[in-house]
UniProtKB/Swiss-Prot annotation:
The keyword Manganese applies. NCBIfam families: pgm_bpd_ind. It comes from Chloroflexus aurantiacus (strain ATCC 29366 / DSM 635 / J-10-fl). Keywords: Glycolysis, Isomerase, Manganese, Metal-binding. This is 2,3-bisphosphoglycerate-independent phosphoglycerate mutase. Substrate binds at residues 124, 154-155, 186, 192, 262-265, 356. Pathway: Carbohydrate degradation; glycolysis; pyruvate from D-glyceraldehyde 3-phosphate: step 3/5. Mn(2+) 1 binds at residues 423, 427, 483.
Length: 540
């Protein structure tokens, strides 16, 4: 049988598998093409959370972890598990980079600032790591330790911060160290889409003590709830003393430890602190936006001055070349899927819109920034809207057009595309919008799959984790905006020789089995470190 060309991996981001129900937007959506392929083509489900992707048991999956496992071809030991294991083993408390930050403030009699996403969400950060840093500060008898909490409400319930605050206040009371200085919704502190006006508001609270004011973190959160503002969108708020002064701000000579272990939403705020060329970078970004006819914010934020003698530690590497210290440096996947394809002399094409572009490039390629030889990439800009329920189709039509052009060019042996809609719209909690998001993906695939088949190619359609299939929280009955532990779909669409009569996809698989499956379709041998197994079982 002739090798199929192109082999296309289609990732329906956040489209998990769950029983039908009023909160299963993926099932409620009118998706005749996806429904037919799931019913009539070789189909299975894949483990996409917990131990299946190198996370703690029961931990929800996410896009970074998912794409890393998909590309690696083996279960990748995730940073959450890696850091938590270091805490359990005691290695965390002798980490040389963390100790360097401790020594920095001791020598200068300055302050240590701990900032990051707050709570047990486990996608970007985990409260256990913050608690361990407080324990470290306690062991070294630090007095001036300030916390800057970025409220979640997305990977956890929308209004869950007060419960996490109870836990944190208990830890602070037990250890006798730590004072909360600011709180901010992740919408501001963790923007990743170059909306610098949001980052600027978070930075102003952290460094200048400018923003909303509240006498305590609890008061700040309760005031936001009273205005019907959930955790994710809490305005950057400065906790003030009885005299109205900021409890603490980040100053020259201080040390900062950014507790996020996932890179993508930590980069922008980190740049605000450490990038010497920040203002020029921001200016050029908005000049490009203006030239492209895109709307500009009412005011363009610029950093007034860069802090001096600042020891800035990130828990993991957020980006190559950032002038920071890294507590847990990367351990690269050396031979990911893209490398094997490149080494075979084949051409490949990676495409997604902005929100998922790092996932089909950096994460899929094992943490490598640069493309491999023979690898082309295309970034489709995500729409500039406040939240994606306002435009649930996002940029799926534009992704589809560019993908069709790549298929029609007949240049590529392998193509990977990510449709961001089910996940990004899923995070808004709006069931009608998520239904439209899933329908937008179905409409795109209705055009893409026939083009693949016409050229003698095959499509392997998967998800990287669940989200859209569970929009109602089973405990509260309210909106569920987080990822899930549900399995991901996996189905193979091809011509003669690839139907149910010739092939089945084995059960019990996980995301790490996707790369070996694709390499079998490409008639290539997996790299020696790929311990995943092809899902394809050929019938006799």
């Amino acid at each position: 049988m002739t090798r199929p060309r192109p082999v296309v991996l289609i990732i329906m981001d956040g489209w998990g598998i769950a029983p039908p129900g009023p909160g299963n937007a993926a099932d409620l959506a009118d998706t005749p093409h996806v429904d037919a392929w799931m019913a009539n083509c070789p189909f299975t489900t894949l483990g996409a959370s917990g131990l299946d992707v190198g996370l703690p048991e029961g931990q929800i999956g996410n896009s970074e972890v998912g794409h890393l496992n998909i590309g690696a071809g083996f279960v990748v030991y995730q940073e959450l598990t890696r850091i938590s294991k270091a805490i359990a083993d005691g290695d965390f408390f002798t980490n040389p980079v963390l100790l360097q930050a401790i020594e920095h403030v001791k020598q200068r009699n300055s302050a240590l600032h701990l900032m990051g996403l707050f709570g047990p969400g486990g996608v970007h950060a985990h409260e256990d790591h913050l608690h361990a840093l407080l324990e470290l500060a306690h062991r070294h008898h630090l007095q001036r330790v300030y916390l800057h909490l970025f409220l979640d409400g997305r990977d956890v319930l929308p209004r869950s911060a007060l419960g996490f605050l109870d836990t944190l206040e208990g830890v602070i009371a037990r250890l006798g160290v730590g004072t909360i200085a600011t709180v901010s919704g992740r919408y501001y502190a963790m923007d990743r889409d170059k909306r610098w006006e949001r980052t600027g508001r978070a930075y102003a609270a952290l460094v200048d003590g400018v923003g909303e004011k509240a006498p305590s973190a609890r008061a700040a959160i309760e005031a936001s709830y009273a205005r019907d503002v959930s955790d994710e969108f809490v305005l950057p708020t400065v906790i003030v003393t009885a005299s109205g002064e900021p409890t603490a701000t980040v100053r020259d000579g201080d040390a900062v430890i950014f507790t996020n272990f996932r890179p993508d939403r930590g980069r922008q705020l980190t740049r605000a602190f450490v990038d010497p060329d920040l203002n020029e970078r921001i200016r050029q970004h908005y000049e490009r936006q203006k030239a492209e006819g895109q709307p500009l914010p009412a005011t363009i934020w610029q950093r007034e001055r860069q802090l001096r003698d600042l020891c800035f530690v990130t828990m993991t590497q957020y980006e190559e070349g950032l002038p920071v210290l890294v507590a847990f440096p990367p351990r690269y996947v050396t031979n990911p899927l893209a490398a094997v394809i490149s080494q075979a002399g084949l051409r490949q094409f990676h495409i997604a819109e902005t929100e998922k572009y790092p996932h089909v490039t950096f994460f899929l390629n094992g943490g490598r920034e640069e493309p491999f030889p023979g690898e082309d990439r295309q970034l489709i800009p995500s729409p500039k809207v406040a939240t994606y329920d306002l435009k649930p189709e996002m940029s799926a039509p534009e992704v589809t057009e560019a993908l069709l052009a790549a298929i029609d060019s007949d240049q590529y042996d392998f193509i990977v595309v990510n449709y961001a809609n089910p996940d990004m719209v899923g995070h808004t909690g709006s069931i009608p919008a998520v239904i439209k998001a899933c329908e937008a993906v179905d409409a795109g695939l209705a055009r893409v799959v026939p083009a693949i088949l016409e050229r003698g190619g095959v499509a392997l359609v998967i998800a990287d984790h669940g989200n859209a299939e569970q929009m109602i929280d089973p405990e509260t009955g309210g909106p569920h905006t987080a990822h899930t532990t549900n399995p991901a779909p996996c189905f193979l669409i091809g011509g003669a020789g690839y139907g149910k009569d010739a092939i089945e996809l084995r059960h019990g698989g996980r995301l790490a089995d996707v790369a070996p499956t694709l390499l079998e379709l490409l008639e290539l041998e997996p790299s020696p470190d790929m311990t995943g197994q092809s899902l394809i079982v050929r019938r006799a």
